[in-house]
């Protein structure tokens, strides 16, 4: 799949990533209880999550500023999506750009959409929409240890 990114992202992706261009805050998002905040965090141990280029966060934020992203291992990109993510208002082009970036630039093998299980219905809303673009529910017995099936509903997309 060839990547068609906007010129802002294309210029940045041509630069080499060095240590200063890596966002260390992506190893874990702090939990927040402030009004308006999404109210969840990645609760994986620091050694499990991998640093990503700042460019990754910019591309994810172009889809939705409320999404959080990290890499689990070398070949899996995980995106935490708030339970109240509206279906409307998400740019289809930006979402496809994100999937292409994960494949072409980050060389990921899969993208995980992670939802708090207690706060969503897997057959409605945004999880339902993701099924139309090729995301499939992740088998409960395949959940990463730090994203337990009791707490998270995960959908997987093979890039």
From Swiss-Prot:
One GO process term, biological-process aspect: positive regulation of protein catabolic process
One Pfam match: ODC_AZ
Alphabetized Gene3D superfamilies for the sequence: 3.40.630.60
Organism: Caenorhabditis elegans
SUPFAM superfamilies: Acyl-CoA N-acyltransferases (Nat)
This protein's name: Ornithine decarboxylase antizyme
Top-level taxon of the source organism: Eukaryota
Biological function: Ornithine decarboxylase (ODC) antizyme protein that negatively regulates ODC activity and intracellular polyamine biosynthesis and uptake in response to increased intracellular polyamine levels. Binds to ODC monomers, inhibiting the assembly of the functional ODC homodimer, and targets the monomers for ubiquitin-independent proteolytic destruction by the 26S proteasome.
Similarity-based family: Belongs to the ODC antizyme family.
GO molecular function: ornithine decarboxylase inhibitor activity
GO CC annotation: cytoplasm; nucleus
Subunit (UniProt): Interacts with ODC1 and thereby sterically blocks ODC homodimerization.
Record InterPro entries: Acyl_CoA_acyltransferase (IPR016181), ODC_AZ (IPR002993), ODC_AZ_sf (IPR038581)
Top-level taxonomy: Eukaryota, Metazoa, Ecdysozoa, Nematoda, Chromadorea
């Amino acid at each position: 799949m060839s990547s068609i990114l906007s010129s802002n992202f294309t210029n940045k992706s041509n630069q080499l990533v060095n240590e200063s261009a890596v966002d260390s805050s992506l190893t874990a998002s702090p939990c927040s209880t402030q009004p308006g905040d999404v109210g969840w965090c990645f609760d994986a141990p620091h050694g499990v999550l991998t640093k990503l280029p700042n460019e990754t966060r910019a591309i994810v934020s172009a889809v939705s500023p409320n999404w959080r992203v990290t890499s689990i291992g070398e070949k899996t990109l995980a995106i935490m999506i708030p339970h109240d993510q509206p279906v409307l208002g998400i740019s289809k082009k930006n979402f496809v750009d994100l999937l292409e970036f994960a494949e072409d630039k980050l060389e990921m093998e899969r993208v995980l959409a992670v939802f708090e299980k207690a706060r969503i219905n897997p057959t409605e809303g945004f999880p339902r929409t993701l099924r139309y673009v090729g995301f499939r529910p992740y088998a409960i017995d395949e959940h990463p240890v730090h994203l337990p099936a009791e707490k998270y509903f995960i959908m997987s997309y093979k890039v």
